[in-house]
Amino acid sequence: MKHLLVSLLALLTATAAFAQQAAPSCCAKPAPDALVAFASLAADPAFMSGHDAPLPLDYQEAGKLVTYPTPDSSTAHAYQVGPGTKDGKYLLVIHEWWGLNDYIKREADRLAASLPGVTVLAVDLYDGKLATTAEEASRLVQAVDNNRAKNILRGALTRAGAKAQVATLGWCFGGGWSLQAAMLAGKQAVGCVMYYGMPEKDVAKLKTLNTDVLGLFATQDQGISPAVVKQFQADMKKAGKQLTVHSFNAVHAFANPSNPKYDAKAATQANTIALNYLLKKFRLKA
């Protein structure tokens, strides 16, 4: 009887130990949501103070405003420059936190002029809303319905065509969404440019990427900090995906089209790197 009790006690102890070891795998915390993380960052007064309001811009559009259906039985708006050929080459541009303003349209024009034959589609994740102050921009970021934003991007990908070659590009708010758009694009994706956007933190999601990523970051960025970039590099390595990082001795938003105090030297260098990357991805000559 005594031996039986000892055996039962040993069995119970082993079972408890196994349960403790197994618990972390079933109860592990999910990776922090990158979109939620950026929305929280956008509410930080220090982050807000680093974004000066855009100045008035006298600008003549080279493209046109278009609408297209989205999977949620709604309609989305975008600014389009280029041929608009179904199943052609497309660059999806995602605006910074101010919205799809004239500065973004002008940047879309510049990119289209530098990428012959490529349709540049600057999507509007705010559904027509624009911010003119950091406070307004912060509220718009926090009010974004991420499911709606993804449907806007899905609609744009459908507009491009199932066989289209699609690259994505965005700054700040749009930088993070550029990565999200590349993941949504699946086999359509041929490139992704992130200007200091919030990286995806879920390695399982990063594994769905069908393209490499070009990341342009700032060493003095207190939000998308060097530590955040380092973790992104580690996560991409775990996912088995290629990430090329260029870091500039500048602050956040140094290349934002709407930034009245943008760093001309760093922005020019970053834009040149981005353009050369896109030329290669679309197999175009400089």
Residue ranges, per PLM feature:
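Bacterial N-terminal signal peptides
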Residues: V6-A16
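Boundary at the C-terminal end of the N-terminal hydrophobic targeting segment
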Residues: A17-Q21
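Serine-hydrolase catalytic machinery in alpha/beta-hydrolase-like enzymes
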Residues: A22-Q60, K64-A160, F254, S258
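C-terminal catalytic histidine-bearing segment of alpha/beta-hydrolase fold enzymes
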Residues: C26-C27, A239-A286
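Short alpha-helix in the alpha/beta-hydrolase fold that links the catalytic acid
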Residues: E107, S225-D235
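Primarily recognizes the serine-hydrolase "nucleophile elbow" in alpha/beta-hydrolase
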Residues: G155-T208
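Short beta-strand/loop motif that positions the catalytic acidic residue
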Residues: L209, G215-F217
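Acidic catalytic loop of the alpha/beta-hydrolase fold
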Residues: Q220-I224
